[in-house]
Design a protein with these regions (language model features):
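VWA/integrin I-like adhesion module and closely mimicked acidic/polar interface patches used
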Residues: 44, 49, 54-62, 97, ...
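MIDAS-like acidic motif and immediate structural context at the N-terminus
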Residues: 78-117, 224-225
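Ser/Thr-rich, Pro/Gly/Ala-heavy low-complexity intrinsically disordered linkers and tails
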Residues: 17-67, 71-74
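Sec-dependent bacterial lipoprotein signal peptides
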Residues: 1-22
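Short, charged loop segments at secondary-structure junctions
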Residues: 93, 106-116, 136-201, 227, ...
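An active-site-proximal "capping" alpha-helix that borders the catalytic cofactor pocket
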Residues: 118-138
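C-terminal "exit" segments of structured domains
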Residues: 25, 69-77, 289-415
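Structural recognition of the beta-strand scaffold that forms the well-ordered cores
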Residues: 82-87, 91-93, 144-149, 219-223, ...
Length: 415
């Protein structure tokens, strides 16, 4: 894969607030955060980092080292993500050029014994199945996923819901897999504008239901191996309007095509770059002209080049792309909202506690490498988890984070 997208931020929202009694909160301040003592002068730690257990077995309670001074605790959760996938089911995904099957573009299909299938289709189908299986295995109440497959041997109207956006439990994962399974195979053209226009409406009209909360981020993922057979500019205009609309929709572009292909009739990297730029997900400093003639820098979109690769190799690339997108929209930013009963808050008396889905509490130290930091040391509005702490939060979707107010901040000195 040519690049790893970074830099798209999304927040989390305050879901529950609980006052926990009196302690060592800051008195007499004139603002939400009164400045206090710089965190570096507070309870410093020279332990390893997140999860080392050194006086960090968190939570507010009788056995908790924070219980004697904590004044309030605010539970936070990630901002939910509503993701709609648009998947290319056109004939070229099956190695068909409109007249003939292209030599070297098809392989024996493990899902359909005795049939040769386009290696791009085998790869994308199997990668998406792995993505769905992972979501099912680690249920994430902050992520809902739906899908629209355009063209194919079982075509559905772009103005209709295909696989509805929903929490990915066993039933949803099964529905997503079934939409890609034999006897469904690639067929026909690439009506990408029609697909984008119709499915933006589907995404924006999504109403979350339990366990998916409201207030989420709208994400469109467009995957194609060709150029539109309907309206190229319309695709770009639609994504740009969605990015500027209400609700805002950010769009990722995943291109599966060779750089030396004819950009007028087969595959155009510049078009894919424009989709990413219009959708608000092009990495800063990317090369919008990245392609066969100019491979300097990185492409603005997710570029997967099949070339002479096998379906298994293309699958690895595509799965990395879809997981990178998931990682990008998954937040490690937590808002610092004043809890009820907290009084004035000193930023040097704030701690972050992570509770795993198994119930283990860990007080995360303030540390820019593997702990957490403020967005502003004097007037913070949020904390951001880094390194090990962020990885732990993302790896345990059902874990919880609490902002504990009133106790001297546990600080870890980076060595």
């Amino acid at each position: 894969m040519a690049r790893w997208l970074t830099g798209v931020a999304c927040g989390v929202f305050l879901s529950a607030v609980t006052a926990v009694g009196q302690g060592c909160g800051s008195e007499g301040a004139t603002s939400l955060f009164d400045g206090g003592t710089p965190a570096a002068e507070q309870g410093e730690s020279d332990g390893r980092n997140f999860g080392d257990g050194a006086n960090r077995d968190g939570g507010v309670g009788s056995t908790d080292p924070l219980s004697s001074c904590a004044t309030a605790s605010a539970e936070t959760n990630r901002t939910p993500v509503y993701m709609q996938l648009i998947i290319d089911g056109s004939g070229s995904m099956d190695g068909f050029d409109g007249t003939n099957y292209i030599a070297g573009e098809r392989e024996p299909d493990p899902a359909s014994p005795g049939r040769l299938t386009g290696k791009k289709w085998i790869a994308v189908r199997d990668a998406l199945n792995a993505f769905f299986a992972d979501l099912e295995a680690k249920p994430d109440p902050s992520m809902a996923v739906g899908m629209y497959l355009f063209s194919s041997t079982v075509q559905k109207s772009a103005s209709k819901v295909d696989v509805p956006i929903a929490f990915v439990d066993a039933a949803q994962a099964s529905a997503l897999r079934a939409r890609l399974a034999p006897p469904i195979f690639p067929n026909s053209g690439t009506p990408l504008y029609t697909a984008i226009n119709g499915q933006l409406s589907t995404l924006k009209s999504y109403t979350p239901s339990a366990p998916i909360p409201a207030g989420g981020k709208y994400v469109l993922v467009v995957m194609t191996d060709g150029i539109p057979t309907d309206d190229t500019q319309g695709c770009i205009t639609a994504l740009d309007a969605a990015k500027k609309g209400n609700p805002e929709v950010i769009s990722f572009a995943v291109g599966v095509g060779n750089e030396d292909a004819d950009p007028a009739t087969v595959y155009d990297e510049a078009f894919m770059a424009k989709l990413a730029q219009a959708g608000g997900t092009a990495v800063p400093g990317c090369n919008p002209n990245w392609g066969n003639a100019d491979k300097s820098g990185t492409p603005c979109h997710f570029q997967i080049t099949p070339g002479t690769k096998t379906a298994a190799q293309i699958r690895t690339d595509f799965l990395a792309a879809i997981n990178a997108i998931r990682d990008t929209v998954t937040s490690c930013e937590l808002p610092l909202v004043k809890p009820a009963g907290a009084g004035q808050i000193d930023p040097a008396n704030v701690n972050v506690v992570f509770t795993s889905s198994s119930g283990t509490d860990t007080t995360i130290p303030q540390n820019a490498k593997d702990g957490w930091t403020y967005d502003s040391p004097t007037n913070p509005t949020k904390v951001t988890l880094h390194g090990d702490a962020c990885d732990a939060l993302k790896a345990d979707p059902q874990g919880k984070v609490r902002i504990v107010i009133g106790c001297k901040t546990v600080v870890e000195v980076t060595k």
